[in-house]
Structures are given as structure tokens and as C-alpha cells.
């Protein structure tokens, strides 16, 4: 089964073609990072306009390699995300499905990120615990044997990725905050400053990062002579401590020995290092997608579309974009 996947939920325009849920035929992504850097974050209308410009170019490139008539299913993200951005990819996918007379599958963006880890690890089987951690989401999920997903914890305010972006802005490091803090923190001392770990000892599996960000703000207003590298490293350590502790606690309490980390923040080098150290110490299996599958991409959409199509779970062409879609 050949699936065409389209991803336009935020600021990456992506098109991919995947055969039988595992063989990559085409994979194109255009990032808008440089476009949004001058604004210090993603501007929804600007993102949508660039999707309108970039998506036809990527589709043309894809169809130069893959004859359109060989596509069996068209899949696209329909939420969650930015409504204008979502509509660009969703409308294009529906139009292609109609013109090619092929079935259409609407894909949940969060579920697609989870599928990225299965794409990268074909032998991986549930049950497993998944931490979805990105600029828009911080959620702890359980994936059952039937691949159904249940959210057991989530952020009550900012996502971890949002906290990285906001603290990077406070430190004058620019956008996007996750990669730049990761890079700068390598030159700093993560034990230099003690920032709070909100909700770390809370019995729930929920998160809160707004207070941590505010703590950094007050620190910068109060202190003089600090090194940006030390602040970045200490802040990053606080975020990683929270993510690692909550995730392993859920896995331990559920009796599940396999854990996956997905989403843009799953590319963070300190998170990967701390997870692997704890997994080795406590004898857990941990899984990360490769870096290129952590950030938004169309391969994960094609994979999710394949899994739904395989089960006959097609979507009506009346399906609308849902910026607040839940798992």
C-alpha cells in the first residue's frame, strides 16, 4: 500500500510517500524557522501563507519521482495545530484524493508523532509508555496492545517546548529555543543554579512549566554577573529532571518496561543522555526516533495514515481541521 502523507500543522511544510508502512520512497520538508526568527516565534498567518507557497512545490517534486496514479491513499494532518496552517494541507489532500479517486485519511498530529517511533523501530510492539514533548504538547500516554492511546498526564500550562522558547527569549538567544539552549547549555554548568521542579513530587502525571519560566525571569532580574551558559544549562536540567522522573514513574507504576520519547524536544541531547542512563540503571528499554523524525515531518503522517487505512479507518471528505484535537 502506497500512502502519500502531507504535514502542515505548524511551521514545517512536508510531503512524503511511504510504501507498506515501512519503505520510504519520498520525503521532503521545508522549514520556516528563518521566516519566523525575526518575530521570535511562529506567526500563524505567515505560516499559512508559506505553506500555500511551499506545498505545491513539494507535491510537484514528489510526483516527479512517484507517478500520482500509483498512490493508494492520501493522508494529512487535520489537528491539533494552527487552523490556517492545517487547512492548507488538509484542503490539498482532499483535492488530491478526489482527483486521483483514492481514499482519504485524516491524521491526528500527536498520534503521528507516536507512529514515528514505530516507523524507526519496526520490531517495537506495545504496550509502552510514550512521552510526547514538543513546542505545542507535553503529554504522557499509554499505548496498549491494540495500539490505542490513552493520555494519562499533560501540561497544565506551558508545554516544555514553549518553556524553552520563552527562556531562550529571556536570555537573548533567539528562536527556536530548544536547539539553541541545547547547544549553549553544553558550555555551562547544569548544577550552577537551582531552579524549581514544579509538580515533581505531585502524585499526578501532569506537568507545569510556567512557574519554572517565571523563576528564570525573576533570577535574571535579580542577579548580576551570571553566565548565560550556566543559566541555560541549569534551566534545561530542571526541565529534563521533571520529564524523566514523571515518565519513568508512570512506567514503573503501570509495570511497563518499554518507554518511547517523541516530538521536537525528544531531540534534546541532555534528555536523551539522562533517559539512557536511567534506563540502563533500572533495566528499561527506551526508544527515540532519529532526529529528523522528532520534528514535524510527513513520514510520520504517512505511517499513521497507513495504519488507519490498513484497518479500513478512512475519513469523510467533510472532515474539518480541528486546532484543539485530542488523542
Curated annotation (Swiss-Prot):
Chain sites annotated for binding substrate: 132-136, 165, 178, 182, 268
Catalysed reaction, written as an equation: L-threonylcarbamoyladenylate + adenosine(37) in tRNA = N(6)-L-threonylcarbamoyladenosine(37) in tRNA + AMP + H(+)
EC number of this enzyme: 2.3.1.234
GO cellular component, one term: cytoplasm
Similarity annotation: Belongs to the KAE1 / TsaD family.
Any matching Pfam family: TsaD
Subcellular location per the Swiss-Prot or TrEMBL entry: Cytoplasm
Alphabetized Gene3D superfamilies for the sequence: 3.30.420.40
Example GO biological process: tRNA threonylcarbamoyladenosine modification
Predominant cellular place of this UniProt entry's protein: cytoplasm
Class in the EC hierarchy, top level: transferase
Disulfide bonds: none
Protein name: tRNA N6-adenosine threonylcarbamoyltransferase
Requisite cofactors: Fe(2+)
Function of the molecule: Required for the formation of a threonylcarbamoyl group on adenosine at position 37 (t(6)A37) in tRNAs that read codons beginning with adenine. Is involved in the transfer of the threonylcarbamoyl moiety of threonylcarbamoyl-AMP (TC-AMP) to the N6 group of A37, together with TsaE and TsaB. TsaD likely plays a direct catalytic role in this reaction.
Keyword annotations: Acyltransferase, Cytoplasm, Iron, Metal-binding, Transferase, tRNA processing
Cofactor: binding details: Binds 1 Fe(2+) ion per subunit.
InterPro entries recorded: ATPase_NBD, Gcp-like_dom, KAE1/TsaD, TsaD
Binding locations of Fe cation: 109, 113, 296
Assembly description: Forms a hexamer composed of two TsaB, TsaD and TsaE trimers.
GO molecular function: iron ion binding; N(6)-L-threonylcarbamoyladenine synthase activity
Alphabetical list of HAMAP family matching this protein: TsaD
Organism (species): Thermotoga maritima (strain ATCC 43589 / DSM 3109 / JCM 10099 / NBRC 100826 / MSB8)
